[in-house]
Amino acid sequence: MFGMIKNSLFGGVENNEGKLVSKGEKDGVAFEEREYEGGKFVSTEVSGKPFDEASKEAVLRLLKYVGGSNQKYAGMGMTSPVVITSYPAENETLQPNVKVLLRIPSQYQADPPVPTDDTIHIEDRESVTFYSTQFGGYAKEADYVSHAAKLRSCLGPDISYHTDHYMCCGYDPPMKPYGRRNEVWFIKNN
């Protein structure tokens, strides 16, 4: 357990924020278009629970994996962002199911350790282009929903992106009280 905490939370974080393509601002809301490199990711899903509870459970599973709960007992260190795939509901909330992803650290991309938890999977993901907006604080469901609405308004009807889901991203460990970075990503349609 200590290894999980030490390696996942206190160790160096490999940041993967993507390559900036363009940026803009509308009605006081800044947004960017960025390309995010493909590669190997570790993922897990939680269903049947409210977004905040499901996200926390899924993130803890992945922290255990990168902290050494894998067949190599490798404490890999943390990457950011933590990417939570969320699914909008009809009533301005998110559906009670999430898929959480972490990019496997660079030094393990060629041969990632096999998870010991059968709810955790290694997957190859293609590069994507997305539209994003950033905000601070400890993000909860209501924050992501609010900022997704702002991003949707900024992009307007002429920009094409996936509407059945979006990504809720966090870049910081839980013990960082100030200067926190969260984002909402809309995946661009090709």
Swiss-Prot record:
It comes from the Eukaryota. GO terms for molecular function: heme binding. It is found in: Cytoplasm. InterPro entries: Reg_factor_effector_dom_sf, SOUL_haem-bd. Keywords: Cytoplasm. One of its GO terms (cellular component) is cytoplasm. Gene3D superfamilies: Regulatory factor, effector binding domain (3.20.80.10). The keyword Metal-binding does not apply. Forms a distorted beta-barrel structure, with two helices that are packed against the outer surface of the barrel. Porphyrins are expected to bind to a hydrophobic patch on the outer surface of the beta-barrel structure. PANTHER family: HEME-BINDING PROTEIN 1, HEME-BINDING PROTEIN-RELATED. Monomer. Belongs to the HEBP family. May bind free porphyrinogens that may be present in the cell and thus facilitate removal of these potentially toxic compound. Binds with a high affinity to one molecule of heme or porphyrins. It binds metalloporphyrins, free porphyrins and N-methylprotoporphyrin with similar affinities. This is Heme-binding protein 1. It comes from Xenopus tropicalis (Western clawed frog). The gene is hebp1.
